[in-house]
């Protein structure tokens, strides 16, 4: 079948799709066979009714089947947020990725330009001088030689061109905000995944377990798709096939609480300058929240045994200049492609 309308009708009637039906529906969308109106109607019907674990697993299957893969070490990690939280913060996962890479853990970062915020990872990295339009072999070289590589979602999920304009016109989060972090082209088994709403923490951990991930934290921090330093972060940890739920506070990391205003960013150039300032030694709320996310990532990767050790390793990566050097290597290697 090459017609999305029956699936639109089913979801509009508040029926859940099986994994097979969800995969079939997303195959139709990503093949270009659906119209923008059908795609918009389908995405919003899913959102209003609420996407199920099976629907997400099926959709990810369709995404992964069409993506352009990248080779990365077995122990590589991705630090990624769904976006769509509407908070307009600095590029926290981007800075955390550079800290983790500076600590010696390979990072295969998957991200995009901003859709529902002023600056996505790609916007900030582009302003810093990282070349984004490079092929899979060049990205693999970045991961090997720089310790960090950036996979620009549009290049690895070319079928997304069929939904991009509709997503921009809708201007709100859809299931695709959930699918991006679950469709890393390097096939990483270790991830820190931030989600835009607390109700998605546990379901996404289930999805990632069903998809074969090994060591995962899915987090939401008081309105942020990150571990937050403003209050409580809800966490679902996937390890050894089991899911454990718990909460963290800034005090869990030995950090003082901050306000959301202190974390507000701007456009790509503004956020790039703020990121560079932290790498150059500035201490502020942006540094603290990025260190917290890096510390958790170092635990997920098995590099740190607890958050205190993760914070110490992260601070050393900054103070020694190792995180800054990781960015410089990424700029150099990506531009040599």
Curated annotation (Swiss-Prot):
Binding of anthranilate 1, residues: 81, 112
Cofactor stoichiometry and binding remark: Binds 2 magnesium ions per monomer.
Cofactor names: Mg(2+)
Annotated residues for binding of Mg(2+) 2: 225-226
Function: Catalyzes the transfer of the phosphoribosyl group of 5-phosphorylribose-1-pyrophosphate (PRPP) to anthranilate to yield N-(5'-phosphoribosyl)-anthranilate (PRA).
Quaternary organization: Homodimer.
Protein name as catalogued: Anthranilate phosphoribosyltransferase
Gene name for this UniProt entry: trpD
């Amino acid at each position: 079948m090459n017609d999305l309308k029956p699936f639109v009708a089913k979801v509009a009637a508040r029926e859940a799709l099986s994994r097979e039906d969800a995969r079939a529906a997303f195959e139709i969308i990503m093949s270009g066979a659906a119209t923008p109106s059908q795609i918009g109607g389908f995405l919003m019907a899913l959102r209003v009714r609420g996407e199920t674990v099976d629907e997400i697993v099926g959709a990810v299957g369709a995404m992964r089947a069409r993506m352009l893969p990248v080779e990365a070490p077995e122990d590589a990690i991705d630090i990624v947020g769904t976006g769509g939280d509407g908070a307009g913060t600095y590029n926290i996962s981007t800075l955390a990725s550079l800290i983790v890479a500076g600590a010696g853990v390979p990072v295969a970062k998957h991200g995009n330009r901003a859709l529902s915020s002023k600056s996505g990872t790609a916007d900030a990295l582009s302003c810093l001088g990282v070349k984004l339009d490079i092929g899979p072999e060049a990205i693999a070289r970045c991961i090997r030689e720089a310790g960090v590589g950036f996979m620009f979602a549009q290049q690895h999920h070319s079928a997304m061109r069929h939904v991009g304009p509709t997503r921009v016109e809708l201007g709100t989060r859809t299931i695709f905000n959930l699918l991006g972090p679950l469709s890393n082209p390097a096939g990483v088994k270790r991830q820190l995944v931030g989600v835009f709403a607390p109700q998605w923490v546990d379901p996404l951990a289930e999805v990632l377990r069903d998809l074969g991930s090994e060591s995962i934290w899915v987090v939401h921090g008081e309105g942020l798709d990150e571990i937050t330093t403003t209050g409580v972060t809800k966490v679902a940890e996937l390890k050894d096939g089991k899911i454990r739920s718990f909460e963290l506070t800034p005090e869990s990391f030995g950090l003082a609480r901050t306000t959301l205003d202190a974390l507000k960013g701007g456009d790509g150039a503004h956020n790039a300058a703020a990121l560079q300032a932290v790498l150059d030694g500035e201490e502020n709320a942006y540094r603290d929240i990025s260190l917290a996310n890096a510390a958790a990532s170092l635990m997920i990767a098995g590099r740190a045994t607890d958050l205190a050790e993760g914070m110490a390793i992260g601070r050393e990566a900054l103070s020694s200049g190792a995180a800054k050097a990781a960015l410089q290597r990424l700029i150099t290697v990506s531009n040599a492609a």
